[in-house]
A protein has these predicted regions:
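Mid-sequence helix-capping/hinge segment at a functional interface
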Residues: 1-32
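Alpha-helical elements of Rossmann-like donor-binding domains used by nucleotide-donor carbohydrate transfer enzymes
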Residues: 10, 38-41, 70, 87, ...
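Short glycine-centered, acidic/aromatic-flanked micro-motifs in structured strand/loop junctions
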Residues: 25, 58-60, 141
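Short, well-ordered secondary-structure micro-motifs
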Residues: 33-35, 69-70, 129
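Donor-binding and catalytic core of enzymes assembling or modifying cell-surface/extracellular glycoconjugates
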Residues: 38-117, 121-124
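Nucleotide-sugar donor-binding patch of glycosyltransferase catalytic domains
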Residues: 107-158
């Protein structure tokens, strides 16, 4: 999937992206059961426990710009607009780690060979969607609301 990447040096410079963890806390509007509700707690843990060594970023899609304001992470945009797919691929590829709901960017991350985890509730299984790879794993739980930020944080391997 590396073929999908493009040069994002201007975006990297603008946002001073060197070491960063990218989160995808979004999901399809009609599939809210895929959404893990503890991303802000995870962001706080990452910032506190890792002493701000890693920037925490999100990259919302075109219909997620308003929702992105609810997260205490830096929002990566291109001139105020959502990144295009090749830009998103490059942002993911250069990341230190990815944490995502079961979304398109989670599957992109798995196929780009980056380190990360996807969070699955009862809507489907990681096995059924074949998301796990050597560096990309899944956390499967019956109820995403009961999956703590601490448990997710402990799975982050940098």
């Amino acid at each position: 999937f590396d073929w999908s990447c493009t040069d994002i040096s201007k975006i990297n410079s603008k946002f001073k992206l060197e070491k960063y963890i990218i989160l995808f806390p979004f999901c399809s509007p009609h599939l809210h059961l895929k959404k893990w509700p503890h991303y802000n707690e995870l962001i706080k843990l990452i910032k506190d426990e890792l002493k701000n060594e890693y920037k925490v970023v999100i990259a919302p899609g075109p219909n997620e710009l308003e929702e992105a304001q609810n997260f205490n992470a830096e929002c990566i945009l291109d001139n105020g607009k959502a990144l295009k797919i090749p830009q998103l691929s490059s942002l993911i590829k250069k990341s230190s780690f990815v944490v995502a709901n079961d979304t398109g960017p989670a599957h992109m991350s798995a196929h780009l060979g980056v380190k990360g985890i996807a969070l699955f509730g009862s809507h489907t299984t990681a096995y059924k969607v074949s998301i796990e790879r050597e560096k990309f794993k899944a956390i499967q739980v019956a109820d995403l609301k009961k999956l703590s930020a601490r448990k997710v944080f402990e799975k982050i391997i940098l």
